[in-house]
Amino acid sequence: MGLPDASGDLSSEMEVDAFRRLFPLRYFERHLSESIRPDARPLGRARDTTLALGAVASAHGSALAKIGSTTMLAAIKMEVMTPSTESPDEGSIAIDFHMPPICSPIVRPGRPAEAAPVISKQLSDTISSSGMINLKELSLVSGKAAWMAYLDIYCLDADGALFDAALLSAVAAFSHLQIPIVSLNDDGKIELISEEDDGAKLEVEPVNKEKRKLTLSGIPFSLTCILHKNYILADPTAEEESIMETAVTVVLDSSSRLVSFYKPGGPVLAHTSAVQDCVALTRQRVKELQNILDETLSGMEID
């Protein structure tokens, strides 16, 4: 009995790889005809997803989210601000999405990634319209002091479905967030209580006596789908996004209420039946993500 032809196997692998690079769409369509993707996922299945809380020790709330290889690091810093005259009893949230060159070969040093401001706006609109955060919970002294929550999200690996992973990291960071203790000084100004003073007896009555968490409701989750001919691919990789142009992103909250629907472009119109299928896939995905978030929160040690 002869030995396996290793050179033949290697040659075959090289031919497949060459075909994939030269004719990427034909390569993918061969897999789609078998209802499978090159990474062995069924068309409607998302990639493995993980969450880690407290990833940034210096932040008031932080999380690391991974969907497949796509990786996002979210960190929240709280600062005291003067609220606007229009909303004297509300705080504010500022969101910035960053794509450093390390995240993708298409991002070049010195040139801001085109997707970054778009995703920043999508995140701001989604978190605002979902009603996840009651801005009144960020108020300290009516008309005088309120919290400004600065959320920065860094893309560490951009392998597709960036908005989905960014939103998940944002939701997880706000779930992990602990509002710092503050007090009024003799001049009537708000001061943060340092960690050293945290357990000490305060001469001035603190505005909030202990660290607290926000009450989150209607938490939004999203799923991006690629529409190609009669196929719908959930949670696309960067390679799939580059080959098949039409993408839609559905955002639902934890009660399956539609928060938003994004279709950034592409030549194919999203027909009603395709949209309904994407919404159905998103409902299933929301349950998965809610379970992942709940399990991560329950496994976290409370200080």
Name each region found by the language model.
Residues M1-D303:
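Polyanion-binding surfaces on beta-sheet-dominated domains and ring/shell assemblies
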